[in-house]
Amino acid sequence: MVALSVFVRQQPKLSNLSFVTFSEFFSSIITAQRASYWGAFFIAVLSPGFLLGVTQPSHTHSVQNPIGTATLEIGTCDSNGLAGGTCYRAVVSGCPEASSDFAATVKINEPADLNSLKGTVFFTTGGSGQALYDYDQDFIGDSRCSASNCGLMTVQSINAANYRTVQVDFVDPEGVIQEPDGWLTGPATDGPRSLACRYATIVHAVWEVLLKRDKTHLVCATGNSGGGALLAYAITQYGMGNGSGPGPEFTMIETTSGPPYGRIDQGCAGTAAPVSTVSCPPGAQLSEDYGLTTAADFVDPAYSSDVCTVDINSNGTDPYPYFHHDSVLSDDDPAPSYKTFVRSLFGSEDLTAAVPLGLEWYNAITSSKSAACVTGAPHELPEDFDGASTIVTDITTTCK
């Protein structure tokens, strides 16, 4: 194997530093079991070295999250999905709050005519991202797509339009590193927000090493549900939407069916979660409540304990204190503005909390954006022929 290493790492600014003893203490507090949280807190404030009279926990956050480092090793693609690709094993290290290295598969397909290259498009799948877009079982089933694989149709059509396609699968291709929950494998104090560092680092590594920091051609991306959340975190918390991050700066992203982490604090609030009237499907009233299954599968694994499940069972009376901060629409950026054009798609058959939670973020964006409703499309929007066709049209007409 040929190893290509990326040594560029964005460092937090000095202005984000605080009193270390105090910060480290409370970072450890919020990783403890929730049942012992306040007991540990009151013991601490009565102990030597801590100030008396403090009544609220504190945790130091950076407005912009730093990325880690990555290596890319050339591997072998399997026979599924789009033929002619080159696959890499990406190993990410140094992401703050991630306790160990993380590995993922990166599959790249060059267009037939590189001289007519229009740009590069990244693809991520939903949930914990443990599949390539061109062979995700959730995107297979609509007979109107070739081989009933609409994910493959999407990638293939965009590649045929002279775009380089880059797919990310958050599973170690060598099976060495155990990642049961894909990119959401924790624990992390700041949950999905911190763990999205893995995606941002991989995107940067591909751009830095393989694309040679190419600023001549555009970089765009699409992702469904949790995969769309990775794009939203990248342009918001990792600076890839306004030039403040390590690069690249996305020209356009298309989130489909989300992002479901628009407001985690509201998604984990149980019956206290807001109910919104949405336009897709027209006039439907949808709760932002994740429900216990989604909480257990796609929120709790990012933390050190079942914090979302606990909050749902309490109907919002026992919240994890940093859910709002950990959201895409966070308390440190309530009115996001990007140089990146944001396009959001929803399906009329999607009645999940991802719709109103995704709209929480979309509606707060103050920069250039647009949204659309795909009639008949489910939450797994790229599984639907019309949904997949809309993605292809949007990217090939907007990413240019």
Q: Where in this protein do the model-derived segments appear?
A:
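Primarily recognizes the serine-hydrolase "nucleophile elbow" in alpha/beta-hydrolase
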Residues: T216-S276
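Cap/lid segment of the alpha/beta-hydrolase catalytic domain
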Residues: T165-S194
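Short, surface-exposed "cap/lid" segments of acyl-processing enzymes
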Residues: P111-I158
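Alpha/beta-hydrolase active-site loop
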Residues: P187-R213
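Serine-hydrolase catalytic core
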Residues: A295-T375
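N-terminal cap/lid segment of alpha/beta-hydrolase-fold proteins
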Residues: V63-S116
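A fold-wide structural signal in alpha/beta-hydrolase
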Residues: T120, N159-D169
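Catalytic active-site module of serine/aspartate enzymes centered on a nucleophile-bearing elbow/loop
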Residues: D384-K400
